[in-house]
Amino acid sequence: MDSADPQLARFLHQLQAETQRQKFTEQVHTLTGRCWDVCFSDYRPPSKMDGKTQTCIQNCVNRMIDASNFMVEHLSKMNGGSA
């Protein structure tokens, strides 16, 4: 196949985008697992959440959002888009 083939180029672009999405999803799962381990030391949520646990979860979620925004901006720049 010719490398200038537009269908091939489109396919390769879609493949790259899907690979990036998969890596992002794996990252989210990893971070979620880490936050769970940090915030719930006994691996199960308590019947009533105390202030310390609530703060831990809030901070963790905020860091995940920050990481997500960073990754979206980075992927957008890689694809030639604007953030």
Curated annotation (Swiss-Prot):
It comes from the Eukaryota. GO terms for cellular component: mitochondrial inner membrane. A motif (Twin CX3C motif) lies at residues 35-60. Heterohexamer; composed of 3 copies of ddp-1/tim-8 and 3 copies of tin-13/tim-13, named soluble 70 kDa complex. Associates with the TIM22 complex, whose core is composed of tim-22. Mitochondrial intermembrane chaperone that participates in the import and insertion of some multi-pass transmembrane proteins into the mitochondrial inner membrane. Also required for the transfer of beta-barrel precursors from the TOM complex to the sorting and assembly machinery (SAM complex) of the outer membrane. Acts as a chaperone-like protein that protects the hydrophobic precursors from aggregation and guide them through the mitochondrial intermembrane space. The twin CX3C motif contains 4 conserved Cys residues that form 2 disulfide bonds in the mitochondrial intermembrane space. However, during the transit of ddp-1/tim-8 from cytoplasm into mitochondrion, the Cys residues probably coordinate zinc, thereby preventing folding and allowing its transfer across mitochondrial outer membrane. One of its GO terms (molecular function) is metal ion binding. It is a peripheral membrane protein. InterPro entries: Tim10-like, Tim10-like_dom_sf. It is found in: Mitochondrion inner membrane. Pfam families: zf-Tim10_DDP (PF02953). Keywords: Chaperone, Disulfide bond, Membrane, Metal-binding, Mitochondrion, Mitochondrion inner membrane, Protein transport, Translocation, Transport, Zinc. GO terms for biological process: mitochondrion organization; protein transport. Belongs to the small Tim family. Disulfide bonds join C35-C60, C39-C56. SUPFAM superfamilies: Tim10-like. This is Mitochondrial import inner membrane translocase subunit Tim8. Gene3D superfamilies: Mitochondrial import inner membrane translocase subunit tim13 like domains (1.10.287.810).
